[in-house]
Amino acid sequence: MNIFHEILSGATKYPERLAIVEHDQDYTYRQLLDAASQVAQKISAMPISQRPIIVFGKNGFLSLATLLGVSLTGRAYIPVDAHTPFERTQLIKQAANPSLVIHTVELEEKFSQLFTSRISYTEYQENIAFDFSQIDSRQAVSGEDINYIIYTSGTTGLPKGVAVTHNNLLSFTKWMNKDFSIIENNHFLSQALYSFDLSIFSLYPSLTTGGTLISLSQEETTNFKKLFERLNSSTINTWVSTPSFIEICLLDPSFVEENHPDLQQFIFCGEELTHKTASKLLDKFPHAKVWNTYGPTEATGAITSIQVDKTILQDYKRLPIGTAKPGVEIQIIDDEIIIIGDSVAQGYFENSEKTAEVFFDYEGKKAYHTRDSGYFDENSVLNYNGRIDFQIKFNGFRIELQDIEAHLYEIAEIEKALVVPQENAAHKVTGLIAVIHSSLSFETKAEERAFNKKIKPQLSNTIMDYMMPTKFIYLDDFPLTPNGKIDRKALTKQVLGGKN
């Protein structure tokens, strides 16, 4: 099986079916694949190498058609969102050394100067009559070819390009379609940026089964009024997002099953799904399936899943992350989750040093060090226990920051929580700051102190004395990354005033 053969075959069977719906425009499979074929034809006619191609733009029809067009030429695509800061874009271009940049938006002058070898989407629209049935799909990415490269943050500040092969993506897509019962003509929420690997949860399961992508623009996802209006006017069957994004949507009183009877399942990845969020969601959508999944970008989207229902909520205070997909083995070595098998990416693109640090061979199979702490419970279900990177030493004790956060979430009035270590000039931890967003509204510092006095005894019942936060800060909002996750780095900087 080849993903792009499947997409082309499906488009031949149902060319007039809607492939993607934007806020003001609908596009059929014929339109999408005709546009992708135009891209492929233009690239193939250019005297460029087989190196990866950067696609610079916003979510939607133009960028999706371009991604597919690049794949049809046998090249890897590198999605870079148009809202990406210039300095980061510059680092990605330097690291990737692409053969070409295709931009689907107008460029600012500094980006025009950066992208010296580039073409605009409008430059191949002269072939508008090109029929996708003429494309030779044998040239498409296949097997162990790199399908896409997602650039993630590196500890040194330099982005690392995770090189995901067609076989990686194929394994993921087949698992999604089977285990999540993706049927033909399903309508998927497509909210995640294409430069964020959560996007593949919607894109490829939808396109390989004749589904429709309900595409949200960044203008819609960052404006609550526009977001709620768009959701209420859309038919969605399968919801894909980070937990932080659904928490925003749950603020809308009209976001309930009665108003969204077609919403059959919610799939979450990208960050931890809290007990509280899952419980709220099931209260509002009692007949929908709620899936908690887990997996780093380096393991192609996700590699474990579990359906969260009332029984799971009753049995677990901190939600488990499930069981492994076919073709993947999970080992716990020194408390660390190790992923082995056909979902493990090729490595970091042209970065052998960083690749060697976390990718390795395990009994003849590809394996990856996640740096996530975890364990299997008595039901052989995998549980996430926080980032090993977030373990600190405080007064001689090793403390997992996310362990404290998990217990803060158990307190009814706490909606969001994050624990920040406070360090002195010698980088020694001198205190723990709990940053909290509460359902209560505190008008005065006295009210905050009264709440602290109330919750400390509750925390004392679940955490050791040395884990007790030394300071509590209350915020109305938590900053989010463009990918919809809580921005831990920005929040830490905000709390510590730029100093640690």
Residue locations for each model-derived region?
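Core catalytic subdomain of AMP-forming adenylate-forming
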Residues: T28, Q41, P85, N97, ...
